[in-house]
């Protein structure tokens, strides 16, 4: 008899925990979706653009914002300005001039990330041109 009561109590407790966990997961998913929508609205990016940006950040190990800060450039991006700042910082941080390989690597990675962004911008412009050509 006591085992039966203990089993009922354990099952009731397990059921309550399962319901609470399910509700918490549902709430977390809803909040994540709302946060993604707010981020997309504030940046003006679609969900796929945000995903592409996150993939680029993960692949290269550096965010676009960090890259812009390292090379001291602002948006909208200008290739000549980026190249000028990159050359200057890369040469200044040369080991023979008292720089370090670490800093040169950071400058190189920042340029690499910005180049990736230039590629995405060009791809977007090409798609836009193709769509305009199809509609005409």
From Swiss-Prot:
It comes from the Eukaryota. Residues 32-58 are annotated as: Disordered. Keywords: Membrane, Mitochondrion, Mitochondrion inner membrane, Protein transport, Translocation, Transport. GO terms for cellular component: TIM23 mitochondrial import inner membrane translocase complex. Signal peptide: none annotated. It is a peripheral membrane protein. Its main location: mitochondrion. Coiled coil: none annotated. The keyword Mitochondrion applies. Probable component of the PAM complex at least composed of a mitochondrial HSP70 protein, GrpE, tim-44, tim-16 and dnj-21/tim-14. Associates with the TIM23 complex. The J-like region, although related to the J domain does not have co-chaperone activity. This is Mitochondrial import inner membrane translocase subunit tim-16. It comes from Caenorhabditis elegans.
């Amino acid at each position: 008899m006591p085992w039966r009561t203990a089993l009922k109590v354990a099952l009731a407790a397990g059921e309550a925990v399962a319901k609470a966990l399910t509700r918490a997961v549902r709430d977390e998913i809803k909040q994540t979706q709302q946060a993604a929508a707010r981020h997309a609205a504030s940046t003006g990016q679609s969900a796929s653009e945000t995903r592409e940006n996150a993939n680029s950040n993960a692949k290269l190990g550096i965010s676009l914002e960090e890259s812009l800060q390292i090379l001291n450039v602002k948006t909208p991006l200008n290739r000549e300005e980026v190249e000028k700042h990159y050359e200057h910082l890369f040469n200044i941080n040369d080991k023979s001039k008292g720089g370090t390989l670490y800093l040169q690597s950071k400058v190189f990675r920042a340029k690499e990330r910005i180049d990736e962004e230039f590629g995405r911008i060009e791809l977007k412009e090409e798609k836009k041109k193709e769509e305009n050509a199809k509609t005409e």
